[in-house]
Protein backbone atom coordinates (compact mmCIF):
# COMPACT_ATOMS: atom_id res chain seq x y z
CA UNK A 1 0.00 0.00 0.00
CA UNK A 2 1.38 3.40 -0.97
CA UNK A 3 1.18 6.64 0.96
CA UNK A 4 -1.30 8.01 -1.58
CA UNK A 5 -3.58 5.01 -1.06
CA UNK A 6 -3.45 5.37 2.72
CA UNK A 7 -4.01 9.12 2.51
CA UNK A 8 -6.84 8.63 -0.01
CA UNK A 9 -8.66 6.15 2.25
CA UNK A 10 -8.61 8.49 5.19
CA UNK A 11 -9.61 11.67 3.42
CA UNK A 12 -12.49 10.67 1.12
CA UNK A 13 -15.36 11.33 3.60
CA UNK A 14 -13.51 14.30 5.08
CA UNK A 15 -12.82 15.67 1.60
CA UNK A 16 -16.48 15.38 0.58
CA UNK A 17 -17.68 17.13 3.74
CA UNK A 18 -14.99 19.80 3.30
CA UNK A 19 -16.07 20.37 -0.31
CA UNK A 20 -19.76 20.62 0.62
CA UNK A 21 -18.94 23.09 3.39
CA UNK A 22 -16.92 25.20 0.96
CA UNK A 23 -19.76 25.14 -1.59
CA UNK A 24 -22.26 26.29 1.02
CA UNK A 25 -19.86 29.00 2.24
CA UNK A 26 -19.35 30.23 -1.34
CA UNK A 27 -23.12 30.37 -1.83
CA UNK A 28 -23.50 32.44 1.36
CA UNK A 29 -20.59 34.71 0.43
CA UNK A 30 -21.98 35.41 -3.04
CA UNK A 31 -25.40 36.30 -1.62
CA UNK A 32 -23.89 38.53 1.07
CA UNK A 33 -21.47 40.29 -1.29
CA UNK A 34 -24.20 40.77 -3.90
CA UNK A 35 -26.42 42.38 -1.26
CA UNK A 36 -23.55 44.67 -0.22
CA UNK A 37 -22.79 45.61 -3.84
CA UNK A 38 -19.28 44.13 -3.59
CA UNK A 39 -19.33 41.93 -6.71
CA UNK A 40 -17.53 42.57 -9.98
CA UNK A 41 -18.63 40.18 -12.72
CA UNK A 42 -16.96 39.56 -16.05
CA UNK A 43 -13.47 38.66 -17.19
CA UNK A 44 -12.61 42.10 -18.58
CA UNK A 45 -14.25 44.03 -15.75
CA UNK A 46 -12.41 41.89 -13.21
CA UNK A 47 -9.09 42.40 -14.98
CA UNK A 48 -9.64 46.17 -14.79
CA UNK A 49 -10.39 46.04 -11.05
CA UNK A 50 -7.37 43.81 -10.41
CA UNK A 51 -5.16 46.21 -12.33
CA UNK A 52 -6.45 49.37 -10.60
CA UNK A 53 -7.08 48.25 -7.01
CA UNK A 54 -5.93 44.69 -6.22
CA UNK A 55 -5.63 45.45 -2.49
CA UNK A 56 -9.41 45.89 -2.29
CA UNK A 57 -10.15 42.44 -3.78
CA UNK A 58 -10.65 39.66 -1.23
CA UNK A 59 -11.81 36.68 -3.29
CA UNK A 60 -12.01 35.48 -6.89
CA UNK A 61 -14.33 32.91 -8.47
CA UNK A 62 -13.59 31.50 -11.93
CA UNK A 63 -16.50 29.68 -13.56
CA UNK A 64 -16.55 27.57 -16.69
CA UNK A 65 -18.97 24.97 -18.00
CA UNK A 66 -17.76 21.96 -19.97
CA UNK A 67 -18.24 23.77 -23.28
CA UNK A 68 -16.07 26.65 -22.01
CA UNK A 69 -13.12 24.33 -21.42
CA UNK A 70 -12.36 24.44 -25.15
CA UNK A 71 -12.38 28.26 -25.29
CA UNK A 72 -8.66 29.03 -25.59
CA UNK A 73 -9.07 32.78 -25.09
CA UNK A 74 -11.05 32.25 -21.88
CA UNK A 75 -8.46 29.77 -20.58
CA UNK A 76 -5.67 32.29 -21.27
CA UNK A 77 -7.61 34.96 -19.34
CA UNK A 78 -8.12 32.48 -16.49
CA UNK A 79 -4.39 31.76 -16.39
CA UNK A 80 -3.54 35.46 -16.23
CA UNK A 81 -6.16 36.16 -13.55
CA UNK A 82 -4.96 33.17 -11.51
CA UNK A 83 -1.37 34.40 -11.69
CA UNK A 84 -2.40 37.91 -10.67
CA UNK A 85 -4.48 36.61 -7.75
CA UNK A 86 -1.66 34.35 -6.53
CA UNK A 87 0.82 37.21 -6.74
CA UNK A 88 -1.47 39.51 -4.75
CA UNK A 89 -2.53 36.89 -2.14
CA UNK A 90 -6.13 36.80 -3.33
CA UNK A 91 -7.90 33.49 -2.65
CA UNK A 92 -9.29 31.93 -5.81
CA UNK A 93 -11.59 28.98 -6.60
CA UNK A 94 -13.11 27.40 -9.69
CA UNK A 95 -16.77 26.55 -10.17
CA UNK A 96 -18.00 24.25 -12.92
CA UNK A 97 -21.60 25.48 -13.19
CA UNK A 98 -22.11 28.96 -14.64
CA UNK A 99 -25.91 28.51 -14.69
CA UNK A 100 -26.00 27.77 -10.95
CA UNK A 101 -23.79 30.80 -10.36
CA UNK A 102 -26.21 32.91 -12.42
CA UNK A 103 -29.12 31.67 -10.30
CA UNK A 104 -27.32 32.80 -7.14
CA UNK A 105 -26.03 36.15 -8.37
CA UNK A 106 -29.19 36.97 -10.31
CA UNK A 107 -29.91 39.37 -13.14
CA UNK A 108 -27.90 42.43 -14.02
CA UNK A 109 -28.86 46.03 -13.26
CA UNK A 110 -31.18 46.31 -16.28
CA UNK A 111 -33.17 43.34 -15.02
CA UNK A 112 -32.13 41.18 -17.95
CA UNK A 113 -30.14 38.01 -18.12
CA UNK A 114 -26.86 37.92 -16.24
CA UNK A 115 -23.81 38.99 -18.21
CA UNK A 116 -20.39 37.41 -18.20
CA UNK A 117 -20.07 35.38 -15.01
CA UNK A 118 -16.86 33.55 -15.93
CA UNK A 119 -14.98 35.63 -13.38
CA UNK A 120 -16.42 37.17 -10.22
CA UNK A 121 -14.41 39.28 -7.81
CA UNK A 122 -15.54 40.00 -4.28
CA UNK A 123 -14.23 43.30 -2.95
CA UNK A 124 -14.18 44.86 0.48
CA UNK A 125 -16.97 47.38 0.93
CA UNK A 126 -16.04 50.80 2.22
CA UNK A 127 -16.82 49.63 5.74
CA UNK A 128 -13.72 48.40 7.56
CA UNK A 129 -15.82 46.20 9.81
CA UNK A 130 -17.14 43.87 7.09
CA UNK A 131 -16.07 40.41 8.22
CA UNK A 132 -18.08 37.69 6.56
CA UNK A 133 -17.89 34.28 8.28
CA UNK A 134 -18.34 32.59 4.89
CA UNK A 135 -15.30 34.48 3.56
CA UNK A 136 -13.28 33.29 6.54
CA UNK A 137 -14.37 29.66 5.90
CA UNK A 138 -13.42 29.94 2.24
CA UNK A 139 -10.07 31.51 3.07
CA UNK A 140 -9.33 28.58 5.37
CA UNK A 141 -10.48 26.14 2.66
CA UNK A 142 -8.14 27.76 0.12
CA UNK A 143 -5.26 27.76 2.59
CA UNK A 144 -5.78 24.05 3.30
CA UNK A 145 -6.00 23.32 -0.43
CA UNK A 146 -2.72 25.12 -1.06
CA UNK A 147 -1.08 22.92 1.57
CA UNK A 148 -2.02 19.98 -0.72
CA UNK A 149 -0.60 21.83 -3.77
CA UNK A 150 -4.11 22.58 -5.06
CA UNK A 151 -3.66 26.27 -5.82
CA UNK A 152 -7.05 26.79 -7.47
CA UNK A 153 -9.47 24.34 -5.84
CA UNK A 154 -12.74 23.44 -7.53
CA UNK A 155 -15.95 23.90 -5.58
CA UNK A 156 -19.39 22.49 -6.30
CA UNK A 157 -22.22 24.86 -5.43
CA UNK A 158 -25.16 23.37 -3.49
CA UNK A 159 -28.45 22.80 -5.29
Curated annotation (Swiss-Prot):
**Which residues, if any, are the signal sequence?**
none
Q: Which GO terms describe its cellular component?
A: nucleus
Give the UniProt keywords, A-Z.
Apoptosis, Developmental protein, Differentiation
Keyword Cell membrane belongs to the record: no
Tell me if Iron is a UniProt keyword of this record.
Answer: no
Q: What Pfam families does the record point to?
A: Ribosomal_L7Ae
Q: Partners and quaternary state? A: Undergoes concentration-dependent homodimerization, which is required for growth inhibititory activity and enhances interaction with PCNA. Interacts with GADD45GIP1. Interacts with PCNA.
User: Which family does the entry's similarity section mention?
Assistant: Belongs to the GADD45 family.
User: What the protein does?
Assistant: Involved in the regulation of growth and apoptosis. Mediates activation of stress-responsive MTK1/MEKK4 MAPKKK.
Q: What is this protein called?
A: Growth arrest and DNA damage-inducible protein GADD45 gamma
Q: Which organism is it from?
A: Mus musculus
Q: Which gene encodes it?
A: Gadd45g
Amino acid sequence: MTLEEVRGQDTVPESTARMQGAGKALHELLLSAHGQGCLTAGVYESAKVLNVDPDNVTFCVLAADEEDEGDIALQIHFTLIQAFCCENDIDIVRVGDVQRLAAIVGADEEGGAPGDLHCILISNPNEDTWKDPALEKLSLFCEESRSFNDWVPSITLPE
